[in-house]
């Protein structure tokens, strides 16, 4: 007890109490100390949850400020939609702490560069089908984004064209080329209505041009797919002429397999072949000049060689990509990837220049060309575009670029990269501590069956507590990379749902179908991708708790570097060294889904459930209660008899000890050691 200020003990000191009261007081103090120690131990073991602060207006302002900073950093114009998406990126996902699985995410809100090795056709619509051919762009649906910063990766060299004098590394330079074709004059007095003269059509078109060392005009023979016939066999002279002198020549989808010309991208490997030149090594100007009277005194362009004159029509510049150059003399080459409509997109970057037959002046024709969904054009200044090959991967970055779906003559000073929205990505997600299941009803039934197994009730409780401790311990030592790099399945599911609802898929469906056949085709293609996604979803076993993504039964190896997954999300799909081979991964998911088909025997499961419920019947527990009662009774009897037996045994041992002591004294003194009144004759004991 604390002392008084004067140093004398206080009136409540233990020294002033008598013995009995002092003992009671000390016992009370010891009891209080024990209670305090118990309370302290409980407090130390208690994990108090922090008090959640209510969301205040200051918090919302801070979030909006961070979202605005994200838009400023990415140079994205601030709109309600972009601000909403920026808020989604600012709000941090919950940390990962459980089992990870691969999730199938259809139509993700990301863009990947399209490589020259892409085998999917890129459709291009134009507003000048008379002079460019192809499909018409009736709907005029054009979009242009604000400035964005683009940074992705690609397995192959991305499709890139430079319309400026400056060409980024990995891009192709374009230039104006002359396309010539002649049609017959009209003479009704002649058989077939054809006159003796010819009318020459001159068209200046922007396409792959002569760029010095990057162009080889030496004819090379190549074996093309049967889809591209030889022009001289498939299209004869005047085959499409209908007697109209004002009708321009048609575009012919054919090739000259023995007249291939190769173009090389700046500072990169690979060749782009063009088989649309009838005479790549010989200037046809002299031949035209020698027949000047036949063509109505037509004079070919000055200081410009002519290599694209064909009498049946203008030959479409179908480009074929060769990823790894082989022997140029090898005719049996099958690795050519065709790109049939990209020339129309390049042609729209500048005005078409047309000289009609009999006219001295050239006509300037404005043209626009648009790519269809899911393709988009990334437009930027050449000096702000960087394409670098690191190992087997191409790293593409573009600062202050814009996304658009159409090109016209305003793009003359820019470079363009084709990008697309991938049909799906595979993303590792965490589903927490819950097991993977694809049927909620059966899983709930299993939970109930496990809970009612009477014989495992106590063991389940003990194992459950042990598992909980193990899980908490494993969470405490979880890797930092997994927590920082992987998102939870709930977060990804909600994000994809929000983005899907915010970025509505009604881009084209509202258009009038009766006058927009190409828009309808885009819708059909888009719906086809949706059907493909649904087919994949139906053929894959998915977690039942997530509706907007498909969490597959394939576990994700958390020990793998996150850079491999990041490379896939940035556009690498077929490189096992730095990313995942998505095709192999998809096949593995399909095989596991087939093996994971739920073969639950519902009748057997129901019988098991009924047996478990029957085991909980109190009448069936009577025998267990009887056995427990008999055991308890026997235990009580043993506990009651044990003290008596122990006491008797102790007395017997004391008597034996006394007798031994008396015997030893007699033997030592040779007489009676006990008083006469108490003498007792003991039997003789011999000791050996």
Swiss-Prot record:
Physiological role: The surface protein (SU) attaches the virus to the host cell by binding to its receptor. This interaction triggers the refolding of the transmembrane protein (TM) and is thought to activate its fusogenic potential by unmasking its fusion peptide. Fusion occurs at the host cell plasma membrane. The transmembrane protein (TM) acts as a class I viral fusion protein. Under the current model, the protein has at least 3 conformational states: pre-fusion native state, pre-hairpin intermediate state, and post-fusion hairpin state. During viral and target cell membrane fusion, the coiled coil regions (heptad repeats) assume a trimer-of-hairpins structure, positioning the fusion peptide in close proximity to the C-terminal region of the ectodomain. The formation of this structure appears to drive apposition and subsequent fusion of viral and target cell membranes.
Subunit details: The mature envelope protein (Env) consists of a trimer of SU-TM heterodimers attached by non-covalent interactions or by a labile interchain disulfide bond.
PTMs per UniProt: Specific enzymatic cleavages in vivo yield mature proteins. Envelope glycoproteins are synthesized as an inactive precursor that is N-glycosylated and processed likely by host cell furin or by a furin-like protease in the Golgi to yield the mature SU and TM proteins. The cleavage site between SU and TM requires the minimal sequence [KR]-X-[KR]-R.
Name by which UniProt lists this protein: Envelope glycoprotein gp70
Disulfide-bonded cysteines: none
GO biological process: fusion of virus membrane with host plasma membrane; symbiont entry into host cell; virion attachment to host cell
Glycosylation sites: 127, 143, 498, 557
Residues that make up the propeptide removed upon maturation: 455-456
Gene it is expressed from: env
Organism: Mouse mammary tumor virus (strain C3H) (MMTV)
TM helices/strands, residue ranges: 625-645
């Amino acid at each position: 007890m604390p002392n008084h200020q004067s140093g004398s003990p206080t009136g409540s000191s233990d020294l002033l109490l008598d013995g009995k009261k002092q003992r009671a007081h000390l016992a009370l103090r010891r009891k209080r100390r024990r209670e305090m120690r118990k309370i302290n131990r409980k407090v130390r073991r208690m994990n108090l949850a922090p008090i959640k602060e209510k969301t205040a207006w200051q918090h919302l302002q801070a979030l909006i400020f961070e979202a605005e900073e994200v838009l400023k950093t990415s140079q994205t114009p601030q709109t309600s939609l972009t601000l909403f998406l920026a808020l989604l990126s600012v709000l941090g996902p919950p940390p990962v702490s459980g089992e990870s699985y691969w999730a199938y995410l259809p139509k993700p809100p990301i863009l990947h560069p399209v490589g020259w090795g892409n085998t999917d056709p890129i459709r291009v619509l134009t507003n000048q089908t008379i002079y460019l051919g192809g499909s018409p762009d009736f709907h005029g649906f054009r979009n242009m984004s604000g400035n964005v910063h683009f940074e992705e990766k690609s397995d192959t060299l991305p499709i890139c064209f430079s319309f400026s004098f400056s060409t980024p590394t990995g891009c192709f330079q374009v230039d104006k080329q002359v396309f010539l074709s002649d049609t017959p004059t009209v003479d009704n007095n002649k058989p077939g209505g054809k006159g003796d003269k010819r009318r020459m059509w001159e068209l200046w078109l922007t396409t792959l041009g002569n760029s010095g060392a990057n162009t080889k005009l030496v004819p090379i023979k190549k074996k093309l797919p049967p889809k591209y016939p030889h022009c001289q066999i498939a299209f004869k002279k005047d085959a499409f002429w209908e007697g109209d002198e004002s009708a321009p020549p048609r575009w012919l989808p054919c090739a000259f397999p023995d007249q291939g010309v190769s173009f090389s991208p700046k500072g990169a490997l690979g060749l782009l072949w063009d088989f649309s030149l009838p005479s790549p090594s010989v200037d046809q100007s002299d031949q035209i000049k020698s027949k000047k009277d036949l063509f109505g005194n037509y004079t070919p362009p000055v200081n410009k060689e002519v290599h694209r004159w064909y009498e049946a029509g203008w030959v479409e510049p179908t480009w074929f990509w060769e990823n790894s150059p082989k022997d140029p003399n090898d005719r049996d080459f099958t690795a050519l990837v065709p790109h049939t409509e990209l020339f129309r997109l390049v042609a729209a970057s500048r005005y078409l220049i047309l000289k009609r037959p009999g006219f001295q002046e050239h006509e300037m024709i404005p043209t626009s060309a648009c790519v269809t969904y899911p393709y988009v054009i990334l437009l930027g200044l050449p000096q702000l575009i960087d394409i670098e090959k690191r190992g087997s991967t191409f790293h593409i970055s573009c600062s202050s670029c814009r996304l658009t779906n159409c090109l016209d003559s305003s793009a003359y000073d820019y470079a363009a990269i084709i990008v697309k929205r991938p049909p799906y990505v595979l993303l590792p997600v965490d589903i927490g501590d819950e097991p993977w299941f694809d049927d909620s009803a059966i899983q709930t039934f299993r939970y109930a069956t496990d809970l009612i197994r009477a014989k495992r009730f106590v063991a389940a409780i003990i194992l459950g507590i042990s598992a909980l401790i193990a899980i908490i311990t494993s969470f405490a030592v979880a890797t930092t990379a997994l927590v920082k790099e992987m998102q939870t399945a709930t977060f990804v599911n909600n994000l994809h749902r929000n983005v899907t609802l915010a970025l509505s898929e009604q881009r084209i469906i509202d258009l009038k179908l009766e006058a927009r056949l190409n828009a309808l085709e885009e819708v059909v293609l888009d719906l086809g991708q949706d059907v493909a996604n649904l087919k994949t979803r139906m053929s894959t076993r998915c977690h039942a708790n997530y509706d907007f993504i498909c969490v597959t039964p394939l576990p994700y190896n958390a020990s793998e570097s996150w850079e491999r997954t990041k490379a896939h999300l940035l556009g690498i799909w077929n490189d096992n060294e730095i990313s995942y081979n998505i095709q192999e991964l998809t096949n593995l998911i399909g095989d596991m889904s087939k093996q994971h088909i739920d073969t639950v025997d519902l009748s057997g499961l129901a019988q098991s459930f009924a047996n478990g419920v029957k085991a909980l019947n109190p009448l069936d527990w009577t025998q267990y209660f009887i056995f427990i009662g008999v055991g308890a009774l026997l235990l009580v009897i043993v506990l009651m008899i044990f003290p008596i037996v122990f006491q008797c045994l102790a007395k017997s041992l004391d008597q034996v000890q006394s007798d031994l002591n008396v015997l030893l004294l007699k033997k030592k003194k040779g007489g009676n050691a006990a008083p006469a009144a108490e003498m007792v004759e003991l039997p003789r004991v011999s000791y050996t």
